[in-house]
Design a protein with these regions (language model features):
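Long, low-complexity, Lys/Arg-enriched
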Residues: 1-94, 105-128
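Conformationally flexible catalytic loops at phosphate/diphosphate-handling active centers
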Residues: 97
Length: 128
């Protein structure tokens, strides 16, 4: 089983593009709490619906990151997911993390959470 972990922010299209690159059975969507400016839980729910429409039967788990500007909060959430999945028999190479969404701090936390045990998907808006 491949387990996907995606940090999301104001934009979520990158997650759909990423999922097109391979099989999907389970995805964790990590997002911030609702702010005065942006309803991140709503964005996660909307993305959940899009993913389920494209990939019926996929298991989607949404997790709130308490502080999107604190490195430890994102690292702790990813570490917990990683260890829970490992206990369920998922191998290191079956866990992928998309670090292209969320705040810069969340992306950095995701990048350093489990390098090299997991595969990092790096996407660049500068790619042609």
């Amino acid at each position: 089983m491949v387990v996907h972990i995606a940090v999301i922010g104001t934009e979520t299209a990158h997650v759909i593009e990423w999922l097109r690159s391979g099989s999907i059975e389970k995805i964790y969507l990590l997002h911030s709490k609702k702010t005065a400016e942006i309803d991140f839980p709503k964005k996660a729910r909307e993305l959940d619906k899009q993913i389920k429409k494209l990939y019926p039967g996929v298991e989607i788990i949404k997790r709130v990151i308490e502080n999107a500007f604190n490195l430890d909060d994102t690292q702790d959430a990813i570490s917990e997911i990683f260890y829970n999945e490992r206990e369920n028999g998922v191998e290191n190479q079956e866990i992928t993390i998309n670090i292209t969404g969320g705040t810069a701090i969340q992306s950095a936390a995701a990048a350093i959470a489990f390098v090299p045990p997991v595969t990092l998907i790096l996407m660049s808006s500068f790619a042609t």
